[in-house]
Curated annotation (Swiss-Prot):
GO terms for molecular function: ABC-type vitamin B12 transporter activity; catalytic activity. Pathway: Cofactor biosynthesis; adenosylcobalamin biosynthesis. InterPro entries: Class_I_gatase-like, CobQ/CobB/MinD/ParA_Nub-bd_dom, CobQ_GATase1, CobQ_N, CobQ_synth, GATase_3, P-loop_NTPase. It comes from Brucella suis biovar 1 (strain 1330). This is Cobyric acid synthase.
Length: 483
């Protein structure tokens, strides 16, 4: 079994995913064969791994940081929330059904075998495996049968480092409190802690570090400052989107309704990185900005439920007004399905609503079907005759007259649809804006001169900057010596 270290958080969104990605790049830069692993993830931001299954986008980014192909075994259990009570269960890249509350708690012990099998596969040939926990080990009500945090750490005998987020406040209490409520067996797995997202003079927290060590007996591995490189990396959780605020007005405003079950929102990251573009995330209860030149309907885990939510917010009427003003609309995956005349779900795959009228902006209809399409693709944009690389993760088959004007060509078949005037577009492809030449042509058609940024290179550069920041702020030698 490969050497391993596990990073668990005092809560969700403390920065574990990006931290592990940065440490993966640190280890790679030191000449180590390093791999990422996350036993269980809950996210609608999924990727298609290089071996053809679904994993969390965070593990895809971590694999990139390691310089290795991504694998379903890097995230063997993925939960994709689709209702308030249930999630789609993905095991080793494949759909295994729906997981609901107490039923999933009863199922977790059975999933440990798959988790350990994947952990062994990831570690095969590696010098080091960096493991990311989920949520917090302090949720002791979920400890029985746990596979995400201490249940995995104790089963696999992997030492744990706790991560606290000082930016949200209360980091001393969160770390000391976690120490207090952990069972002795779990507490013994913790080798130390680190502080993330510090702003200002780090020396001002010296007494805080000493206090945490005094209360817990855990050593400090350092304090990570607020690193600008993080903002240039894909975010895993939609909670990050909720913090977005409008800045100085740019040449193109792109409005994105924040659907309740928004998925794969990192499709928007290349647009956010363009100097002349401002991406405005529109929360429920707010109106689409009247000065938007483009509205993007993003992917969603539950198309029908989010279409209903879109209507409840009045965004359907605002979309029609946007189009009448001469605005453009792009629907991606579930957003593409919403643009049509009708969505039918006779088998109730998404829920109790079996048939619903769409937005009617494209002359298409979608029939939900059980078979799920999960694949990486190479395509050609038929709008600009430029190459595209992306991926598909969807259920449903779409047809109709506007499909005669496809968005892209994938191998021997067409994808998507475009309205007769070219202002309404839809595609099943995620990741299209990562293709630099396509993105530049797309923006130019909207009257904006795109920059000459190479998006993939910018992500690599951000990972390198993140690694440099971690090398400078953490006791890396001490951390890696834990494994």
């Amino acid at each position: 079994m490969a050497r391993a270290i596990m990073f668990q958080g005092t809560g969700s969104d403390v920065g574990k995913s990006v931290l592990v990605a940065g440490l993966c790049r640190v280890a790679r830069n030191r000449g180590l064969k390093v791999r990422p692993f996350k036993p269980q993830n809950m996210s609608n931001n999924a990727a298609v791994s290089d071996d053809g299954g679904e994993i969390g986008r965070a593990q895809w980014l971590q694999a990139l940081a390691c310089g290795v192909p991504s694998s379903v075994h890097m995230n063997p259990v993925l939960l994709k929330p689709q209702t308030d009570m249930g999630s789609q269960l993905i095991v080793q890249g494949q759909v295994r059904g729906e997981a609901r509350g107490r039923y999933y708690q009863e199922l977790k012990p059975q999933l440990m075998a798959a988790v350990m099998e994947s952990f062994a596969k990831v570690g095969d040939g590696a010098d080091l495996v960096l493991v990311e926990g989920a949520g917090s080990p302090a949720e002791i009500n979920l400890r029985a049968g746990d596979i995400a945090n201490m249940g995995f750490a104790t089963h696999a005998d992997v030492p744990v480092v706790l991560v606290g987020d000082i930016d949200r406040g209360g980091v001393i209490a969160s770390l000391v409190g976690t120490h207090t409520i952990l069972p002795q067996e779990d507490r013994a797995m913790v080798r130390g802690f680190l502080i993330n997202k510090f702003r200002g003079d780090i020396s001002l927290f010296d007494d805080g570090l000493a206090a945490i060590t005094r209360f817990t007996g855990w050593r400090s591995f350092g304090v990570v400052p607020w690193l600008k490189a993080v903002s240039r990396l894909p975010a895993e959780d939609s909670v990050v989107l909720e913090r977005a605020v409008r800045g100085d007005k740019k040449a193109l405003i792109v409005a994105v309704p924040m659907l309740p079950r928004i998925a794969n929102f990192d499709d928007l990251d290349p647009l956010k990185a363009e100097p002349a573009v401002e991406v405005v995330m529109v929360p429920p209860g707010s109106s689409l900005p009247a000065d938007a030149g483009l509205v993007v309907l993003p992917g969603t885990k539950s198309t029908i439920a989010d279409l209903l939510a879109l209507r409840e917010n009045g965004w359907d009427r605002e979309l029609v007004a946007h189009v009448k003003r001469g605005g453009h609309v792009l629907g991606i995956c579930g957003g593409f399905q919403m643009l049509g005349r009708r969505i039918s779900d006779p088998a109730g795959i998404e829920g109790n609503v079996r048939d619903i009228e769409g937005l009617g902006l494209l002359d298409i209809e979608t029939m939900m079907e059980p078979e799920k399409v999960v694949r990486n693709v190479e395509a050609v944009s038929l709008l600009h005759d430029e190459p595209l690389e992306g991926y598909e993760i969807h259920i449903g088959r779409t047809s109709g007259p506007d499909m005669a004007r496809p968005f892209a060509r994938i191998g021997d078949h067409d994808d998507g649809a475009v309205s007769p005037d070219g202002r309404i577009m839809g595609t099943y492809l995620h990741g299209v804006f990562s293709a630099d030449r396509f993105r530049h042509h797309f923006l130019r058609a909207l009257g904006v001169e795109g920059g000459q940024m190479n998006y993939r290179e910018s992500v690599e550069e951000a990972l390198d900057e993140l690694a440099e920041g971690l090398e400078a702020s953490l006791d890396i030698d001490g951390l890696f010596a834990l494994a």
